[in-house]
């Protein structure tokens, strides 16, 4: 089974929730999403977190190792591809056990641009 690396922000930082949603996923480290900002955007059902490019800003994230089954569960939870799309990038990840930094290809869910920004 192929493993992929998912970067989490918002409610997917909650280990208990992620283990319920994605039982075989495991947290492997942390990273910083450079030149992105964290913000709320809305729909008819409420406000949700997303990330968007913003020069000079950074978003701290957790990094999960996921299987195809975990990714399918995340797709359903995040409303992919209707509500969120997936972006792939390469990031340096700090290992949670070793502290070693390794570059990894990761994926992240980003809300579609046509949804409304919530100002708070």
Report residues per predicted region.
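Glycine-aromatic micro-motifs
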Residues: 1-118
